[in-house]
């Protein structure tokens, strides 16, 4: 008769690659001792598309449609960083109206990104209802995007020196209505989630990061502010026209998954405040600085030359990048999104290095999940908020 014995060696479990609709195609190799996590190794690269190398073979205008595929849930921010770099290198002035439109679009995109973080995060820890609620509000934001840009996602709206089109008639009133409605929905979320005892049991004290670790790991965004550091690039760098608005940096000092949730909920309310102020104070004037459009050619072509024989050969505007280096950054929903740009006195960047917030924040995951339970992995991973498009690039 065979007597069954208890196995005492560690078990290695593959979590993932996850479905793209959740956290992206991330694979975790987890070493378990029963329910306890001994080690965790993230495996990246399933969504690598060579975005940095593609940038070296495209003009900025040609590259704009590519960048919306980094963080495909907050595409306005990747567009903003792509045009901000050449604008600063070339000392290009952005009209005031265009800057206000950009801020409105960025903050709407921030709310949409946080909403699509909140739903799957709650689903990860067992609450299904918020997952359906958040799509109700997110749909309204996408309706606004569609009215202004023509696209619900992958907007391709930002241009060097401004934006592609002006806001359509009646759009501002629609946006006002959305802001008033969304504030009531935020209150509903807080009643439903924030004091829920089951939710608190799953997130309070789970995945704690202290101030020293946050700085050493180079974390940013809600991960940084949830650990007691009031650092928001909208206040620090004053890019676009954020210094003209009255709003507060959202932060907590506990550093756990609950603190990160509270920071993001607070940020959605602050974004509404910024949008309302921008809608009230939006000035008139041009929406794009058309004077800085220059064509990279030595002479004007003749009417019978080869270039004019095909309509597809009509040249797009190209912007010559000076021979300089520049690091430009903005506060994306997930943290500091930066680009290190080297110009080479032509239309193509010599180097285009992306600093994605999700990739940096994901590094601390193995340390956070060690000595935790298996069920806590999804709670901690969800609270970090990653999108594999920008992690793998």
From Swiss-Prot:
Pfam families: Complex1_49kDa
Location(s), subcellular: Plastid, Chloroplast thylakoid membrane
Residue ranges crossing the lipid bilayer per the database entry: none
Record's catalysed reaction(s): a plastoquinone + NADH + (n+1) H(+)(in) = a plastoquinol + NAD(+) + n H(+)(out); a plastoquinone + NADPH + (n+1) H(+)(in) = a plastoquinol + NADP(+) + n H(+)(out)
InterPro entries: NADH_Q_OxRdtase_suD, NADH_UbQ_OxRdtase_49kDa_CS, NDH1_su_D/H, NiFe-Hase_large
EC number(s) stated in the UniProt entry for this protein: 7.1.1.-
Topological relation to the membrane, as annotated: Peripheral membrane protein
Record-level GO BP terms: photosynthesis, light reaction
Oligomer status and interactors: NDH is composed of at least 16 different subunits, 5 of which are encoded in the nucleus.
Family to which this protein belongs: Belongs to the complex I 49 kDa subunit family.
Name this protein carries in UniProt: NAD(P)H-quinone oxidoreductase subunit H, chloroplastic
Species of provenance: Glycine max (Soybean)
Lineage summary: Eukaryota, Viridiplantae, Streptophyta, Embryophyta, Tracheophyta
